[in-house]
């Protein structure tokens, strides 16, 4: 095969929500290093802080046109893992997918948690979620009672983060730290 002259890794172009005006594409410069197999900083973070690797089986219950589902799914692929996509979020369907595919991680929003917590106890108990080691969540503040109930149910696997589509920074808190400072 003939090599392509410029095999630099591409970058995604996400669109802002338009909070401060019209939605616009957030253009990120192409990486300087031409190696397509180089890991970017977000992949390094996902592999380090979140444990994404070749054994990761990631559940994406949200549409890929949103920044977080797209970016986290891309990071799982870059780490060599597997992504399970849901066509549409359904609380019991998410539990069934986690059980069936033995997912190890996923990205959620507080509304997903609320809907899963509203399921009857016997429905929730029907599914084995013991393979989950990382449930990242963002998009809105998670109410203290909801987060506490999720940690009680799934264990200390929740990691909350705050970031922007522009890629200008991120902050994270794991379950252990959150439990010492609820509402953080």
Task: Give the ranges of each region predicted by the language model.
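Glycine- and other small-residue-rich loops at beta-strand/loop junctions that grip anionic moieties
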Residues: 2-5, 61-62, 86-87, 139, ...
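Gly/Ser/Thr-rich phosphate-binding loop
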Residues: 12-18, 78-79, 103-108, 117-182
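Short Gly/Pro-enriched turn/cap motifs at secondary-structure boundaries
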Residues: 4-5, 181-184
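Short beta-strand->loop structural element characteristic of the AMP-binding/adenylate-forming
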Residues: 24-27, 82-88, 159
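Conserved AMP-binding A3 loop
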Residues: 3-4, 11-40
């Amino acid at each position: 095969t003939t090599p392509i002259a410029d095999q630099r890794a591409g970058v995604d172009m996400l669109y802002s929500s338009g909070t401060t005006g019209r939605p616009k594409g957030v253009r990120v410069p192409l990486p300087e290093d031409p190696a397509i197999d180089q890991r970017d900083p977000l992949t390094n973070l996902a592999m380090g802080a979140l444990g994404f690797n070749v054994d990761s089986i990631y559940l994406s219950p949200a549409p890929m046109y949103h920044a977080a589902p797209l970016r986290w799914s891309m990071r799982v692929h870059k780490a060599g893992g597997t992504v399970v996509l849901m066509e549409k979020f359904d609380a019991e369907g998410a539990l069934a997918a986690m059980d069936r595919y033995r997912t190890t991680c996923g990205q959620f929003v507080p509304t997903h948690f609320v809907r899963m917590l509203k399921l009857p106890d016997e429905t929730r108990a029907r599914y084995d979620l013991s393979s989950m080691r990382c449930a990242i969540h963002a998009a809105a503040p998670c109410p203290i009672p909801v987060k506490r109930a999720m940690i009680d149910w799934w264990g200390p696997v929740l990691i909350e983060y705050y970031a922007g589509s522009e890629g200008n920074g991120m902050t994270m808190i794991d379950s252990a730290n959150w439990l010492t400072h609820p509402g953080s």
